[in-house]
């Protein structure tokens, strides 16, 4: 699968968005669920920051997440998701709430700590943030 990047900001590489990217290279993409079937291991915590590819990563890790219920820190970008489709951010939020009982908006550098009780709590976001998802 191609990944698009620019030398000045490798952290902004994207599988979904080619705009303003000067470099393209092929990368192997595997589902976490498939990897763990071949290499069994317990998962206690996950960090997902994949520049708009969150839904696909969550789908590829669904069995793992439902089985182990790892704590999750996920970058969440409603403005980016709205470029994909108007309901994309809601779909991700609903998936997270189907697994996790507690979701908190902790900001980019953990400068905030707000309980997220509904999707409407996320709708005012004008930039990306991190969500901390747990069951305790």
Feature annotation, model-predicted:
Residues 34-136:
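Conserved acidic-Pro-Pro-aromatic motif
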């Amino acid at each position: 699968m191609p990944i698009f990047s620019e030398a000045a900001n490798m952290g902004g590489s994207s599988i979904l968005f080619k705009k303003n990217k000067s470099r393209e290279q092929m990368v192997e993409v595997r589902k976490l669920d498939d990897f763990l079937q071949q290499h069994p291991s317990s998962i206690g915590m996950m960090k997902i920051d994949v520049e708009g590819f969150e839904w696909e990563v969550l789908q590829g890790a669904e069995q793992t997440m439902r089985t182990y219920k790892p704590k999750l820190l996920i970058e969440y970008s409603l403005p980016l998701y709205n470029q994909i489709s108007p309901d994309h951010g809601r779909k991700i939020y609903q998936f997270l709430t189907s697994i996790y009982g507690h979701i908190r908006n902790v900001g980019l550098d953990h400068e905030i700590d707000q309980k997220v009780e509904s999707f409407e709590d996320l709708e005012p976001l004008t930039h990306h943030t991190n969500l901390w998802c747990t069951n305790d």
